[in-house]
């Protein structure tokens, strides 16, 4: 299924039904009083978070969503039927933004969470409502209210516990497939991953969700590469796992490239707990691995976990550490 994380839609509440002008007319009551009923209310527009959804694809090809109008009132004081509410299911993590994108109207962060964004119009009043001691046969009614309407943006920010970051071809997708049942596309060239991928890790009777986003390059926060479009999907994560390809040159420069991009995009990303890994260690000798650890760790003042997604070396220890950090946060 195509991954869509942004959509602009028009939503409108249903119109209220008109009130009715009617008079009681029966065989032996030729001049009965007013009995016009009120109109029904228009339907509301309701958003609901659904954990079974992970894309806004349903809003790509349909842009206008209208709730049902209320029915007009009728004689014998019958109130018109209210319009049916329109329920729009969106993935958990969807933000509803104003048309200019400057205001977050609501953030759906839980499964089953509901938000009534627009109320339908109220039904009009029938002539029974206007009967009084000085006006026994009113011919007055009111029309139903027009339902409110607006354009809104839907922005999806995936919910995960752990976000994977790194340069293109750092081994993020291979790592995700090694620790979860996710099956992202894997190939030996940059930008294999074109959309975010989610996977669930099960360890020691616990579980956590991992998000893999397309690789970052210098200038990602300015729109270079694919990172700018997808960095938002790790804004909600609790921990960042930073993967460095041990076979690459300039490891220190590569490390700071990613750190700079995270800082430039969002201070909240910069301040998240970071766990650093060397990937593809199965291609290097123990001497080379140790040499690079001793070279880099003192400079950045961080522990680096050497791992291999191919042989599973170091994976168990890394996952245990991730779980420990998650339990602290």
UniProtKB/Swiss-Prot annotation:
<feature type="binding site">
    <location>
        <position position="193"/>
    </location>
    <ligand>
        <name>Mg(2+)</name>
    </ligand>
</feature>
<feature type="binding site">
    <location>
        <begin position="279"/>
        <end position="282"/>
    </location>
    <ligand>
        <name>GTP</name>
    </ligand>
</feature>
<feature type="binding site">
    <location>
        <position position="173"/>
    </location>
    <ligand>
        <name>Mg(2+)</name>
    </ligand>
</feature>
<keyword id="KW-0963">Cytoplasm</keyword>
<keyword id="KW-0547">Nucleotide-binding</keyword>
<dbReference type="InterPro" id="IPR014100">
    <property type="entry name" value="GTP-bd_Obg/CgtA"/>
</dbReference>
<keyword id="KW-0460">Magnesium</keyword>
<dbReference type="InterPro" id="IPR036726">
    <property type="entry name" value="GTP1_OBG_dom_sf"/>
</dbReference>
<dbReference type="InterPro" id="IPR031167">
    <property type="entry name" value="G_OBG"/>
</dbReference>
<dbReference type="GO" id="GO:0003924">
    <property type="term" value="F:GTPase activity"/>
</dbReference>
<feature type="domain" description="Obg">
    <location>
        <begin position="1"/>
        <end position="159"/>
    </location>
</feature>
<dbReference type="GO" id="GO:0005737">
    <property type="term" value="C:cytoplasm"/>
</dbReference>
<dbReference type="Pfam" id="PF01018">
    <property type="entry name" value="GTP1_OBG"/>
</dbReference>
<comment type="similarity">
    <text>Belongs to the TRAFAC class OBG-HflX-like GTPase superfamily. OBG GTPase family.</text>
</comment>
<feature type="binding site">
    <location>
        <begin position="166"/>
        <end position="173"/>
    </location>
    <ligand>
        <name>GTP</name>
    </ligand>
</feature>
<feature type="binding site">
    <location>
        <begin position="191"/>
        <end position="195"/>
    </location>
    <ligand>
        <name>GTP</name>
    </ligand>
</feature>
<dbReference type="InterPro" id="IPR045086">
    <property type="entry name" value="OBG_GTPase"/>
</dbReference>
<dbReference type="InterPro" id="IPR006169">
    <property type="entry name" value="GTP1_OBG_dom"/>
</dbReference>
<feature type="binding site">
    <location>
        <begin position="212"/>
        <end position="215"/>
    </location>
    <ligand>
        <name>GTP</name>
    </ligand>
</feature>
<dbReference type="GO" id="GO:0005525">
    <property type="term" value="F:GTP binding"/>
</dbReference>
<keyword id="KW-0342">GTP-binding</keyword>
<dbReference type="InterPro" id="IPR006073">
    <property type="entry name" value="GTP-bd"/>
</dbReference>
<protein>
    <recommendedName>
        <fullName>GTPase Obg</fullName>
        <ecNumber>3.6.5.-</ecNumber>
    </recommendedName>
</protein>
<feature type="domain" description="OBG-type G">
    <location>
        <begin position="160"/>
        <end position="327"/>
    </location>
</feature>
<feature type="binding site">
    <location>
        <begin position="308"/>
        <end position="310"/>
    </location>
    <ligand>
        <name>GTP</name>
    </ligand>
</feature>
<dbReference type="Pfam" id="PF01926">
    <property type="entry name" value="MMR_HSR1"/>
</dbReference>
<keyword id="KW-0479">Metal-binding</keyword>
<dbReference type="GO" id="GO:0000287">
    <property type="term" value="F:magnesium ion binding"/>
</dbReference>
<dbReference type="InterPro" id="IPR027417">
    <property type="entry name" value="P-loop_NTPase"/>
</dbReference>
<dbReference type="GO" id="GO:0042254">
    <property type="term" value="P:ribosome biogenesis"/>
</dbReference>
<comment type="subunit">
    <text>Monomer.</text>
</comment>
<keyword id="KW-0378">Hydrolase</keyword>
<comment type="function">
    <text>An essential GTPase which binds GTP, GDP and possibly (p)ppGpp with moderate affinity, with high nucleotide exchange rates and a fairly low GTP hydrolysis rate. Plays a role in control of the cell cycle, stress response, ribosome biogenesis and in those bacteria that undergo differentiation, in morphogenesis control.</text>
</comment>
């Amino acid at each position: 299924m195509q991954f869509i994380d942004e959509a602009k839609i028009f939503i409108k509440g249903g119109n209220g039904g008109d009130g009715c002008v009617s008079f009681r007319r029966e065989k032996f009551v030729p001049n009965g009083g007013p009995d016009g009923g009120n109109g029904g209310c228009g339907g509301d527009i309701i958003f609901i978070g659904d954990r079974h959804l992970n894309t806004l694809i349903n809003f790509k090809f349909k842009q206008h969503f209208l709730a049902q109008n209320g029915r007009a009132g009728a004689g014998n004081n019958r109130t018109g039927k209210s319009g049916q509410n329109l329920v729009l299911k969106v993935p958990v993590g969807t933000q509803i933004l104003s048309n200019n994108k400057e205001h977050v109207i609501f953030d759906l962060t839980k499964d089953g969470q509901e938000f009534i964004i627009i109320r339908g119009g109220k039904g009009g009043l029938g002539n029974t409502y206007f009967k009084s001691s000085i006006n026994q046969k009113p011919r007055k009614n009111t029309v139903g209210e027009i339902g409110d309407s607006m354009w809104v943006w839907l922005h999806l920010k995936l919910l995960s516990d752990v976000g994977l970051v790194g340069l293109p071809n750092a081994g993020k997708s291979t790592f995700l497939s090694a620790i979860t049942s996710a099956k992202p596309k894997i190939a030996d060239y940059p930008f294999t991953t074109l959309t975010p991928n989610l996977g669930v890790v099960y360890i020691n009777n616990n579980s956590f969700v991992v998000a893999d986003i397309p690789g970052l390059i210098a200038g990602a926060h300015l729109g270079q590469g694919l990172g700018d479009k997808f960095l938002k999907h790790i804004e909600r994560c609790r921990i960042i796992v930073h993967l460095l390809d041990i076979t690459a040159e300039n490891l220190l420069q590569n490390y700071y490239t990613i750190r700079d991009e995270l800082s430039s995009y969002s201070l909240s990303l910069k301040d998240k707990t970071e766990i650093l890994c060397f990937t593809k260690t199965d291609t290097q000798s123990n001497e080379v691995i140790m040499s690079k650890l001793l070279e880099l760790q003192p400079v950045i003042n961080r522990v680096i976990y050497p791992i291999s997604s191919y042989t599973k070396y170091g994976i168990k220890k890394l996952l245990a550490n991730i779980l420990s950090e998650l339990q602290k946060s």
